A protein has these predicted regions:
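Periplasmic-binding protein-like
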Residues: 42, 118-126, 151-155, 194, 198-255, ...
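Ligand-binding cleft/hinge of the Venus flytrap
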Residues: 64-73, 151-171, 201-205
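Flexible hinge/capping segments at coil-to-helix
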Residues: 126-143
Length: 266
């Protein structure tokens, strides 16, 4: 009987130890260190970018700052290489990736993604006089994307057959450089986010460029480490709270002229 009791005690301690090892302390970790570090591509307006004073600003930045304030911690925006964002997150140098990031099956495999907070479309931008008004018209054309972007994933995955009809797919580190290349005739189209593309073109005063052909709908979400479910859930809870009290509407209206967020109200 004593031997049986000892065996059961060992098993109970092992199970208890395993449970403790798997306990999610991600929210407590943020509160203890006193900072909430957001990883972003700082050339992705209006979600996150550098203003004329070199300060990092944007819609996502304003929302994340409010989340950090409600957590009672300091907000830090940490620029990262978008092509290595998953490595930056896994290494622990940032707490989340929050920068107009599309929700994809691949990203849901490697990260704990939030619910969508903003709807978007992936659009081919062309020169206004190019006469490209359909996907078929892109055959034989050169198309630019940002390295590590959802656009790149689409053309190498679900839309690989379409990409095979292009003369080439060009990779750029920043969309601004890609749009300037398009303007100068270096490529025939740029596949990018509608929200970002329209903002960039308006800011450039590029009346010679236009949103020509839509490829697919898209949703933005926030990515956390797979084990940080509690932190992901807490941020979702705060976003819902901000939707209810009108804070999200206020921030969205400042950047987009109206509330285009899709955060659930409960």
């Amino acid at each position: 009987m004593k031997k049986l009791f000892a065996t059961l005690l060992v098993l109970m301690l092992e199970v208890s130890g395993l449970a403790m090892a798997e306990e999610d302390t991600s929210v407590e970790n943020i509160l203890e260190k006193g900072t909430f570090i957001l990883g972003l591509d700082d050339s992705f307006p209006p979600m996150g970018f550098r203003d004329e004073n070199n300060d990092i600003v944007g819609f996502d930045i304003d929302v994340a700052k409010e989340v950090a304030a409600r957590l009672g911690v300091e907000f830090i925006a940490q620029p990262i290489s978008w092509d290595a964002k998953e490595l930056e997150l896994a290494s622990g140098t940032i707490d989340c990736i929050w920068n107009g990031m599309s929700i994809t099956p691949e990203r849901e495999e490697s990260m704990a993604m939030t619910f969508p907070y903003l709807n978007n479309q992936m659009i081919f931008y062309t020169r206004a006089d190019a006469g490209i008004d359909s996907l078929e018209a892109l055959a034989g054309k050169s198309v630019a994307v940002q390295n590590g972007s959802y656009a790149e994933e689409l053309l190498s995955g679900d839309y690989a057959d379409l990409a095979a009809t292009f003369s080439e797919v060009l990779g750029f580190d920043e969309y601004l450089t890609a749009l300037m290349d398009l303007q100068n005739g270096g490529c025939d189209a740029v596949l990018m986010d509608l929200v970002v593309g329209d903002y960039r073109i308006n800011g450039m005063g590029a009346t010679d460029l236009k949103a020509a052909v839509a490829l697919t709908d898209d949703n933005y979400g926030i990515g956390f480490r797979k084990e940080d479910i509690a932190l992901r859930d807490k941020v979702e809870e705060l976003l819902i709270e901000m939707k209810k009290d009108g804070t999200l509407e206020k921030i969205s209206t400042q950047w987009f002229g109206s509330d285009i967020t899709v955060v659930p109200a409960e």
